Amino acid sequence: MRLITRSDFDGLACAVLLHEVEQIDSIEFVHPKDVQDGKISVGSNDILTNLPYQFGVGLWFDHHSSEIVRNEDTASYRGRFEIAPSAARVVYNHYVEKGKGEKLLRYDGLLQSVDKSDSAKLSMNDVTKPGGWMLLSFVMDPRTGLAYHHGYRISNRELMTKMIELIAKNPDDPDTVLADPDVKERIDRYFQQQEAFTQLMRERSTVEKNAIITDLRGVAEMPSGNRFLIYTMFPQANIQVRVFDGRKGEFVVCAVGHSIFNRTSRTDVGALMDKYGGGGHRGAGSVSLMDDPEQQIRMILAELKANG
């Protein structure tokens, strides 16, 4: 079967688990917007994980709350959907019920870290001094920005494929995974650019009522950095609106996330993003805006401030 998943830590964990329980012949790492826009053709021999549902797919696994709004017909697919800390946890739960859980038990430590990372149940220390699987989660997260830099020994897609086997061989030993030369060169860049990233966040961010607005449009070279650091810098805010240029400048991306330390926001972000054609969870989501993005951003911000 062909596995189609997201290019992040959760998508990677899904791939690791599915390799244990299904015959995976090929893997594609894709952007959720391409799936939403119908640019990815799927069929009965495909597995879709951590991505929006597409009619006709063989198996679908997801946990994004926005999919409840988007797809009311839950009888038309095979696989599993549930509100869970991660899509990898949904995959795990499905195969445990199918009697194949024994093959997946050795990934318990990895799964706990994926759950913690994807649901953003992190401590201040996890963000400022990450290590182990948590550090890997930030390195593999496209939002960290490491993939936009060049000069690596292998491409990011090649690294994702390599990581599946590397994790399978070392399910209880994240330090061995982190020591791999192709992983380590990305870790080194992550820490080298942390100061520049923090400075840029301060320069490009303002606070309106309860919301941080970080406008990164026009930034030619974005330093890599942890997207959660912003909440350590503005602890009084409970939500962030992050705006940046989309692929090839064809659209504007608006990413919204609850503060992981000041958890007082009343906005269901996934539902709000769905209204504009995006998606996500209650605590985080994004949307790609093509028509009059400025007005739509102000409308999104107004709702966030009104909700408190």
Positions of PLM-derived features:
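Hydrophobic, aromatic-enriched interface-forming segments
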Residues: 117-210
